[in-house]
Every structure is written in C-alpha cells, then in structure tokens.
Amino acid sequence: AQARLLNRLASEKKQQAVIHIKYDTGFHRIGFPDCPESLDEIRQICSMPWLKPEGIYSHLALKDDQSNQVQFRCFMDAVNELESEGCHFRYKHIADSIAAVDFPEYRLDMIRAGAIVYGLKGFHKGQLDIRQALTFKTRISHITPVLKGQGVSYDYLWTAPQDTRVAALPFGYADGYPRNLRGKAMVTLRGKQVPVIGVICMDQCMIDLTDVPEAQIGDQVIIYGDGSGNTLDIDAVSRLAGTNKNEIVARLTRRPPRIYVRGNDSGTGYSSAERMTP
C-alpha cells in the first residue's frame, strides 16, 4: 500500500522516487517478513514505473555469531533470488557500526555508521583505533556557601557533611543529563573530579566544591569527555545511569550549543570557544 501510494505521488510530480526496501530477517521491527509472498511484493515494487529501488537492507539483532550468520544468509538468499529475476539494487546493506567492525564480510555495498561516528566503541572482536569525539562542557554560573547540615536541591536528599561551597551548573535533565545520576556522577573541575550533589533539576544541577576551594564563577566544567584529563567518558556515565552509550548521546537535546572542531594545536580536539551550556 505504501509503495503504491508513493508511486502515485511520484507520478503526479513526474519525478521518480528513489527508495530502499527493508527486508526483515529476524529483528522483527519493520520491513517485509522473510517469506515467498514478500518476495512477490518486492518484485511488484521493482516493476512500478515511478519507483527506483536503489537499495535493499536489513538489520542484525547482534545476539550472537550464529544468529548473525542466519540473518545474513537469509538476507543474501533473498537478494540473490530477487536479482536473478531482474530486481537489481545498487546498494545492499545490513551492517551497523558494530557489525561493520566485528564482521567485515557484512559490509557489502554500504554501512550504516551511527555510534562509531562519535568514537563510541560497541564492537568486541574487531580492532579499530578510534577516540571519543564528543565532550560535554559547561561553566559554573553561581557559587553559594552551605553550612554543615544544610540541604541542597529538592527534598534535601543531600546535606552538607561540613561547611562548604556549592556551585550551580546551568544544565539539567532538560538538556539530556540523566536524572538518576544523582549521588553517582562526577564532573571534572580544574583537573579534579567533584561530585554532583542533590536532585538534578530541569535546568541546573549542583556540585560540591569541598575539594576545589579555589573554584570561581566562570570556571569550565567537563560533564563528560574522552576519559583523558581525569574526565568521565560516556562509557562510565552510561554505566552509572544504568543504560548504554548510545542512549546517553541520544538524550542530548537541542538546547546545548554544538561546537564542531577539527582539532587544535594541543591535539585534544577541544574547542577553544568560550560558551556556556545551555
């Protein structure tokens, strides 16, 4: 039904629609199920005059090597049968970031690089020298003295064990920082790890400055980085949050400004731009 509708719309615009056909080999999310009837439907799509099936693809569940091989073989059997009957595809693709590294034979004509673009390593077998390309930074926006026994943030779930100073950082869960990191996460300030304290708010969170008494408003704080310079990397943050690396990155909302860099003289890849988040 979707193909017929798209064919009609393309006909009305007198412009051929370029499409990729999803073939479900066992992930059971979307796509044509693996059966003869599906191959018949795909043949019909290939014959529609205003559709150009440029590619065909599937997605691996990545359960284990054996199930990956079953899915790959299923995909290639379907593709080979279709191409033997005149359905030709410029691109055949089944490999995401993990499969592209761990199983080079699955790369075919195209790979769908996702997490690997950010330097996130999800692969286990393959070797690829990459470095995390994402650093999440902010700056101290406010510092307030807190006396021993006084509470911080909602419900006073953190109380000061001694007289100290508390810094507010202008980011929170509305920026994509997991709220369940309360009492677990550390951020990096002046080369030292300092704890995130109290309940993480929508637009702000707080850190304890006990170990960095010299901290000042405007100081840069690294929320997470590539693991160098005493920073937490995304792996560590995801473990603390009880999730995976991809979700931590995907949580980032549009509010934090993105600064794209090619690297600098120090080789860190950090931006020299002075901007606050959000």
Where do the PLM segments sit?
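C-terminal accessory subdomain/extension
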Residues: P145-P278
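Active-site loop/helix belt of alpha/beta enzymes
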Residues: R4, R8-V18, D24-L147, P213
